[in-house]
Amino acid sequence: TAKTFNERMQKLESHIYELAGEKFNIASPKQVGDILFGKMQIMEKPKKTKTGQYVTSEEVLQSLRSKAPIIDDILAYRGLKKLLGTYVEALPKLINPKTGRIHTSFNQAVTATGRLSSSDPNLQNIPVRDDDGKEIRKCFVAEPGCLFFSADYSQIELRIMAHLSGDENMI
């Protein structure tokens, strides 16, 4: 629930402030960079953007995880914030009052690769890699007597086109 996510974020926030020795906006890449690279100096020559700000992307922070415990907490905080805003709080608002379901739109001619995409909301991107993502995925439940089917076929659109066209070169 949103309450659980918020409680976990508050604990992480308190711990981050304790490790940093001060309060700052954890959602601000600039302030995170100033704390990690300016104040705590966890790296000798940190990367900077064209505007002179420290780079605090997930990739950079992942590479520095062993340098300071605060980094794991910042990454965890960012992850929870993303899940909270994108799924936990947003998806319930998208439930159709008539059907009690969330409806997506599948787009056939949007991607450069010809693959299907999903939007409003993107239900092809529901997290599953970690425990929090698995909990979010559990919110999607099939009606009694029905089931969800998930398949990820390599180049399925191209394979269907080859089959339907009967083109010997494609088959």
Describe each model-derived feature in a short phrase.
Residues 1-131, 141, 145-147, 154-157, ...:
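Conserved "right-hand" nucleotidyltransferase catalytic core of DNA-directed polymerases
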Residues 160-161:
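A short beta-strand element within the Helicase C-terminal
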Residues 169-171:
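Conserved divalent-metal-coordinating catalytic cores
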